[in-house]
């Protein structure tokens, strides 16, 4: 009986850890520097990605390096990475290659959308509804599906290799991902609070697990 109860408890715990949750109006809060505080997201992926759009909001006053979105596979830790450097530049990595953008800086919550397509390699970064000059990388590449997706830390190993000096301190929310490139009109609609049925990560039906000191709190942006 005790073994049966223990098994049921484990099953319930795992079920709760990755249950779908509507996160509208909420944000993940990372209140202090840590090498073991992060959120792991579970994606719906059935085939290699040849395009993507990732959108999210971040509120932080950090002036150092930090990771906004980290998607790693066992063969490539920077399969997808959105990273802010200490010189106020933002880099997008795909398959270990990266391009750099330098958008405006703001003390307000910032909205980011990054897109990439394999056919041309065209890579875009949108900040608060405004596009940066397009770049190109990893033309013809396909992204692996057996992924570890982490918020709050950069992965220097699959689901690990975290460094305290690259962690996020602040809030992150409205995280959505599609397996195609959204149009400029769609990106601006997402920036304004709309959505287009995200089919990889959906903030309205998010599967996640928090580790360390991370909290779910009401969002601080409209």
Swiss-Prot record:
Residue ranges of domain Pentraxin (PTX) in the record: 24-222
Subcellular location: Secreted
Record keyword Metal-binding present: yes
Tissue expression per record: Found in plasma.
Induction conditions: The concentration of CRP in plasma increases greatly during acute phase response to tissue injury, infection or other inflammatory stimuli.
Keywords: Acute phase, Calcium, Disulfide bond, Metal-binding, Pyrrolidone carboxylic acid, Secreted, Signal
CDD domains in the cross-refs: PTX
InterPro entries, per database record: ConA-like_dom_sf, Pentaxin_CS, Pentraxin-related, Pentraxin_domain
Co-factor: note: Binds 2 calcium ions per subunit.
Binding site for Ca(2+) 2: 154, 156, 166
Binding site residues for Ca(2+) 1: 78, 154-156
Gene Ontology CC terms, in alphabetical order: extracellular space
A Pfam family this chain is assigned to: Pentaxin
GO molecular function: complement component C1q complex binding; low-density lipoprotein particle binding; metal ion binding
Signal peptide annotation: 1-19
Cystine pairs: 55-113
One BP annotation, GO: acute-phase response
Pyrrolidone carboxylic acid carried by residues: 20
Function of the protein: Displays several functions associated with host defense: it promotes agglutination, bacterial capsular swelling, phagocytosis and complement fixation through its calcium-dependent binding to phosphorylcholine. Can interact with DNA and histones and may scavenge nuclear material released from damaged circulating cells.
The protein's assembly and partners: Homopentamer. Pentraxin (or pentaxin) have a discoid arrangement of 5 non-covalently bound subunits. Interacts with FCN1; may regulate monocyte activation by FCN1.
PANTHER family found in the cross-reference section: C-REACTIVE PROTEIN, C-REACTIVE PROTEIN-RELATED
Similarity annotation: Belongs to the pentraxin family.
Protein name: C-reactive protein
Lineage: Eukaryota, Metazoa, Chordata, Craniata, Vertebrata
Gene giving rise to this polypeptide: CRP
